Regions:
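A beta-rich soluble binding module of mature secreted/lumenal proteins
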Residues: 2-185
Length: 185
């Protein structure tokens, strides 16, 4: 009986941790309002990111988003592993955490496990985006082109710093190859 109670408590704590991890956003960050997912779809080049094990040793990283029949967003991430000298890709699924006009989503590449994906800055033409994860360990700067203007870069770095990110830890992603996965969905 005691083991069943302990097991029940552990399952409950695990479920709470999982739920909170997929719905959180850094304290000082706010997802973009009046978000239009249709304008966000398509190819985004990764300009900068923190060092994550899922993207370790990747250059030329891109993310491609397309709307599926359920109204959720199919994700195809790809990049060139410069140590293994080969292209890699991962397919995922993004879902809105609430109102579809708010850029607060959760994304999964591993079955039922989701992580926060929050667009916290976006230019009016949907060319540049600043994306926060669930906490201050996850941050991306994205662009529709392989580079980003210096003024946009500085603006997004300032926003990230105001949220609490240590932007000195950003990795600036090399974009010098064309992905064989580009425009593949």
């Amino acid at each position: 009986m005691k083991n069943k109670i302990i097991f029940g408590v552990l399952v409950s704590v695990g479920a709470l941790a999982l739920l909170s991890s997929c719905s959180s956003i850094p304290k000082n960050a706010k997802p973009v309002a009046n978000f239009d997912v249709n304008r966000y779809l398509g190819t985004w080049y990764e300009i900068a990111r923190f060092d994550y094990r899922f993207e370790k040793d990747l250059d030329n990283a891109i993310a491609q988003y397309s709307l599926n029949a359920d109204g959720n967003v199919d994700v195809l991430n790809s990049g060139y592993n410069f140590k293994k000298e080969k292209w890699v890709s991962a397919k995922g699924l993004a879902k809105f955490r609430g109102d579809k006009k708010t850029a607060a989503l959760k994304v999964s590449f591993f079955g039922p496990f989701y992580a926060g994906y929050n667009v916290i800055a976006l230019d009016e033409d949907y060319r540049y985006a600043l994306v926060a994860g669930k906490n201050l360990d996850y941050l991306w700067i994205l662009s529709r082109e392989k580079s980003i203007p210096e003024d946009i870069k500085n603006k997004y770095l300032k926003i990230a710093q105001e949220v609490g990110y240590n932007t000195s830890k950003l990795i600036w992603v090399k974009q010098d190859k064309n992905s064989p996965f580009e425009n593949e969905k």
